[in-house]
Amino acid sequence: MFIKIGIQTAIQKNIDEIYLTHFTEENDYLVTLIEDYGFEKIADKKNGEYIFVKRLFPKKDKTYLPGEISKKFYPCFYDSREVSKFIVPIRPGYHSKLFTDYKRQTKLSEFMEEFIVEGNTIKKAYLCHSKTKGLKEGDILLFYRSNDVRELTSLGVVEKVYENVTEPNQIVSYVGKRSVYSRKEIEEMVNKPTKVILFKWHLHFENPLKYKNLLNYQILKGPPQAIIKISHDKYLKIKGEVKINDRYTFN
């Protein structure tokens, strides 16, 4: 969570890199964690303290795989034609738990109090019974909040997908602390083969795209009931309408 708030602060201040220092230990979980968000060790002090730096933007003279962009240079992501784009419907109750900071700025003090931890992290999990195939690492997820506001609200990037899971313990082991679903909800879901999507949340849209506009732009033909794959051209229309900052996209 502190990584999330640090990155958000860097974006607001227009800073290109952030750093932290840490006294490392053997099998240090924190080092593994920060490396998964693109922190790299650049120096160590005589007292055993290491210095780690995270750069928010990739070097222009290097080539990276789509998943590498999201991992090493989060919140940047790769959005060329090579990656698929999907609209993902989510009911309001789960949307509020999965994206607790939607349309609000989380305060540092909240991290010290009782809070929906899973919903306030970068790494998240989405469970569904959608039969849509082909989701892979690096693909883009466009979350559509159904029923109440009916609009595209947020963007994530796929890390891993598990298909046709029928054991609750398997799901628990896959999602770890990412899940906003209770054990009971998971047990009910696996009555049918369940898709588990692990993803990184990247941003909420400055200008959420309403359902009526999705119809007008022929992006949707009706209310989405399951995950829908869309064309790159439709994604570009969405990208312009919701005002995704090109500074954080690479293609």
For every predicted segment, state its role.
Residues 81-83, 136-138, 151:
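Short gly/pro-enriched beta-turn/loop segments at secondary-structure junctions
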